[in-house]
């Protein structure tokens, strides 16, 4: 375990499984209020499109994606209807997780007012999830794949952080004058949870990146942050290039790469080859 609170939380949940736990009415009401607020926010906000602006929740993203959000938001891929339930699952997980922390006797603080980070271009605001032992933590719900791979450690998260989670945490910590803690991650597939500490985070470097992002967005200059990757088969390059992993979840990937072709893997010999996003194809057959 990576955090002292994990043991206390596991003990409380074990008692709950065995019918030995209790929960206060205050905690039940707090969970209910948090979920109610989430339902109102997700389903009752009317138009979801808001005027673009840098926030703690987006400033860690690649600048090419932010450029599209600012200049061509209409070109984003439409969200599937499952998106709403997925967002609600995350909100419910966070609400219940905080309730479990409370009942497990783990002291924490919540952010009731937005914190502000001063950058060269102005101020960026946001609201962090919680603080334990003087360190800012974020609560994330993740798919089984992300739980096992992306959130395996700080290093794996930092290496493929297309959602900007590391920069976001650094921004919250800097703005609040607290330490950067890490991420409480809950697996949406099976309920497993763990703590991923940001033990190798370079705060000065991350805040400098946020400042650079703000300057780039203000200059309104478009430049791709990721290059196509060389496709390989059995350890050898095929001569083709494919979409960079950093672009896979971007809502603007089709606009950014207008010549991209999605088709079954060219070199694969499987009966049902996986679908690959090709940027350039120089060899049709292997």
Question: What residue spans do the PLM features occupy?
Answer:
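Generic hydrophobic secondary-structure signal
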Residues: 66-68, 97, 101, 169, ...
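Metal-dependent nuclease catalytic cores that hydrolyze phosphodiester bonds in DNA/RNA
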Residues: 1-136, 143-154, 159
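Metal-dependent nuclease catalytic regions and adjoining charged, substrate-binding loops involved
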Residues: 159-161, 171, 175-286
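Alpha-helical structural elements
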Residues: 7, 38, 47, 62-63, ...
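Long, contiguous hydrophobic alpha-helical segments, chiefly transmembrane helices and signal peptides
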Residues: 137-139, 171
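Residue-level recognition of conserved beta-strand positions in structured domain cores
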Residues: 139-141, 185
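Short, well-structured alpha-helical interface segments that form or flank functional binding sites
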Residues: 92, 96, 125, 164-171, ...
């Amino acid at each position: 375990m990576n955090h002292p609170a994990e043991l206390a939380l596991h003990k409380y949940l074990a008692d709950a499984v065995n019918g030995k736990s209790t929960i206060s009415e205050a905690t039940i009401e707090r969970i209910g209020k948090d979920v109610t607020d989430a339902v109102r926010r997700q389903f009752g906000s009317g138009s979801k499109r808001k005027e673009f602006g840098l926030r703690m929740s987006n400033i860690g993203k690649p600048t090419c994606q932010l450029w599209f959000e600012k200049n061509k938001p209409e070109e984003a891929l439409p969200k599937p209807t499952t998106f709403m339930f997925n967002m609600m699952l995350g909100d419910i997980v966070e609400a219940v997780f905080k309730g479990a922390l409370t009942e497990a006797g783990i002291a924490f603080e919540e952010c009731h007012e937005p914190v502000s980070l001063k950058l060269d271009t102005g101020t960026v605001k946001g609201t962090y999830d919680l603080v334990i032992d003087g360190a800012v933590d974020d609560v994330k719900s993740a798919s089984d794949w992300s739980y096992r791979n992306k959130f395996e450690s700080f290093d794996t998260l930092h290496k493929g952080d297309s959602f900007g989670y590391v920069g976001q945490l650094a921004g919250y910590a800097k703005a609040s004058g607290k330490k950067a803690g890490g991420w409480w991650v809950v697996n949406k597939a099976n309920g497993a949870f763990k703590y991923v500490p940001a033990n190798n985070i370079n705060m000065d470097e991350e805040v400098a990146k946020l400042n650079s992002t703000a300057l780039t967005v203000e200059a309104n200059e478009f430049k791709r942050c990721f290059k196509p990757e060389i496709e390989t088969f059995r350890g050898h390059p095929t001569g083709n290039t494919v979409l960079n992993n950093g672009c896979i979840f971007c809502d603007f990937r089709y606009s950014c790469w207008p010549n991209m072709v999605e088709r079954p893997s060219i070199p694969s010999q499987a009966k049902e080859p996986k679908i690959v996003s090709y940027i350039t194809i120089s060899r049709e057959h292997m």
